[in-house]
């Protein structure tokens, strides 16, 4: 796997890990009252989507069970419809989808030459 792909995959994992740390001891309702938390989580989702969009086709093909188009689509939705962010979807993405995605990403050759 080219170094650029490995870097982007690591960026995805770092953003997922950051999101996980941000929600420690938090509840869904905190997104409604804590704008900084919401902005931080949205940014993590954007980074995951942007990094995914810049992966080579070969990198994406090496993990066909990862929903690459949906990941990139989520990023695009957050960027272009910033005025209409669904906090339920952000919370589900970070609490349900991200942990599952992290497991899949860790199976990829992130440190190989």
Model-found features: residue ranges?
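Solvent-exposed interaction patches of small proteins and small membrane subunits
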Residues: 1-113
């Amino acid at each position: 796997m080219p170094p650029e792909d490995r870097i982007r995959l690591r960026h995805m994992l770092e953003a997922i890990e950051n999101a996980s740390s941000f929600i420690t001891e938090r509840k869904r309702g905190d997104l409604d009252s804590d704008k900084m938390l919401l902005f931080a989580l949205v940014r993590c989702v954007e980074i995951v989507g942007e990094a995914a969009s810049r992966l080579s086709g070969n990198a994406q093909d090496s993990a066909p069970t990862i929903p690459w188009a949906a990941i990139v689509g989520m990023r695009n939705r957050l960027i272009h419809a910033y005025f209409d962010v669904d906090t339920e979807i952000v919370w589900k993405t970070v609490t349900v989808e991200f942990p599952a995605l992290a497991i899949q990403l860790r199976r990829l050759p992130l440190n190989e030459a």
